[in-house]
Amino acid sequence: MDFFSVQNILVHIPIGAGGYDLSWIEAVGTIAGLLCIGLASLEKISNYFFGLINVTLFGIIFFQIQLYASLLLQVFFFAANIYGWYAWSRQTSQNEAELKIRWLPLPKALSWLAVCVVSIGLMTVFINPVFAFLTRVAVMIMQALGLQVVMPELQPDAFPFWDSCMMVLSIVAMILMTRKYVENWLLWVIINVISVVIFALQGVYAMSLEYIILTFIALNGSRMWINSARERGSRALSH
């Protein structure tokens, strides 16, 4: 069976109601995601290679299960990984990395906080029409590329506030990671904890377990980057 098909099941995980069928493509994509985050915590530029694999495979998954808005977000994360790879690879004349791990200056931190609060508020109110719009855009693009796709039937979001938090904070965290700001890890911790709870409430315990692992990786990343920033003289919320 085709490796890229979500019907190509690697293993049935007997967790939750009915268990969970883990496909090969999801398993490989998940492993790539774990490697990406683990390497990022070590400040290894190779994290972006695995990040590209992760978002590409999950983009294919979202295409197959007709989550076209999520597919479009993977396009953003793909571009962010490319930019992050470039930004992290830049060096000074002394052949040192141009970007250093540091905290956001207070004015920037407050600006990003305002962006997050306003964006989450707006997304909570308009998440259904926003995802409908993103889905239509994705369908139009794919149809223009010659793919035989139709507009899927969309269901109202079951957790509009929490899904808005995860979407907005994921975008902001990815942007901050490409610039080596410590705060990205704090956001990933929040995102992962929310994901653990949401997937558990939906009965998808295998995914909830995966995000528990991601939470511990993000906590370790926070610890390591905070120590690295301290060694470089960077302090949280400094001017």
UniProtKB/Swiss-Prot annotation:
Annotated Pfam families: NMN_transporter
GO biological process terms, semicolon-separated: nicotinamide riboside transport
Binding site for beta-nicotinamide D-riboside: 188, 192
Cytoplasmic side stretches: 1-21, 69-71, 128-157, 207-239
Induction: Repressed by NadR.
Cellular component terms per the entry's GO annotation: plasma membrane
Described purpose of this protein according to its UniProt entry: Required for nicotinamide riboside transport across the inner membrane.
Protein name in UniProt: Nicotinamide riboside transporter PnuC
Upper taxonomic lineage: Bacteria, Pseudomonadati, Pseudomonadota, Gammaproteobacteria, Enterobacterales
Originating gene: pnuC
